[in-house]
Swiss-Prot record:
Protein name per its UniProtKB record: Uncharacterized protein UU427 homolog
Gene3D superfamilies registered for this protein in UniProt: 1.20.1260.10
Segment forming the signal sequence: none
GO molecular function list: ferric iron binding
Domain Ferritin-like diiron: 1-148
SUPFAM superfamilies to which the protein is assigned, alphabetical: Ferritin-like
Keyword terms, alphabetized: Iron
InterPro entries associated with the record: Ferritin-like, Ferritin-like_diiron, Ferritin-like_SF, Ferritin_DPS_dom
Length: 172
C-alpha cells in the first residue's frame, strides 16, 4: 500500500518530535543534576531522553525504511524553559508528555482516516509506550506533590531504580 502524504507528514512530525524532545530532555537532565543536585532525577530524565533519541528514533527510522517513506529531519532546539525548582521541571515534563499523547492520538487518527492500517498498527506501540512514559513521569510528579522536600523525592526515585534493577527492568 502506498502511504498518503498525510501519513508521511505525521510520521515525519513524530520523528522530529522525538529528536527534539530527546535533546531537550538531555538538557533538563543536566539542570536536574547541576542546578538542583538531584542525580537520580537527572538519571530518570536522561533515560527519558535516551528513550526518545534511541528506541523511538530507531523504530521510526526502521519502519520508514521498511515501507519506503522518506524521513526529513527538521528540528531545532532552544531550551528557553528555566525552572526555578525540580517540581516545576517535572511538572513541565509531565505537560510535555501530555502533548506527546495528543500528538500520537492525532497520528493514529490520520492513519485510520487514510486507511493505512499497517502504519496504524505500528503507531499502537507509541500509544502503549506513551502510556508507560506518562505514568512514570506522573509518578515522579506525584512524589513532588506529596513529599516534604527534594531529598525525600530523590530517595523515592532512587528506590524505584533499585527495585527495577533487582527485577531486571528499566523505568523508561
Amino acid at each position: 500500500m502506498a502511504n498518503s502524504q498525510k501519513v508521511i507528514d505525521v510520521s515525519n512530525a513524530h520523528y522530529n518530535l522525538n529528536l527534539e524532545l530527546g535533546s531537550v530532555y538531555a538538557q533538563y537532565a543536566h539542570i536536574a543534576d547541576d542546578q538542583f543536585s538531584m542525580p537520580f532525577l537527572a538519571k530518570f530524565i536522561n533515560d527519558l531522553s535516551n528513550d526518545k533519541l534511541g528506541v523511538h528514533k530507531d523504530l521510526i527510522s526502521e519502519y520508514a525504511r521498511k515501507i519506503e517513506i522518506p524521513l526529513h529531519t527538521k528540528f531545532s532546539v532552544d531550551v528557553s524553559f528555566k525552572p526555578t525548582d525540580p517540581k516545576e521541571l517535572v511538572k513541565h515534563i509531565l505537560e510535555t508528555e501530555q502533548k506527546v499523547r495528543k500528538h500520537v492520538a492525532n497520528m493514529a487518527k490520520v492513519c485510520l482516516e487514510e486507511g493505512d492500517f499497517e502504519t496504524f498498527s505500528f503507531v499502537k506501540w507509541f500509544v502503549d509506550d506513551g502510556i508507560k512514559d506518562f505514568d512514570d513521569v506522573r509518578t515522579i510528579h506525584d512524589f513532588f506533590e506529596n513529599g516534604n522536600n527534594n531529598l525525600q523525592v530523590e530517595y523515592a526515585i532512587r528506590q524505584i531504580f533499585k527495585a527495577n534493577e533487582a527485577w531486571g527492568r528499566k523505568i523508561i
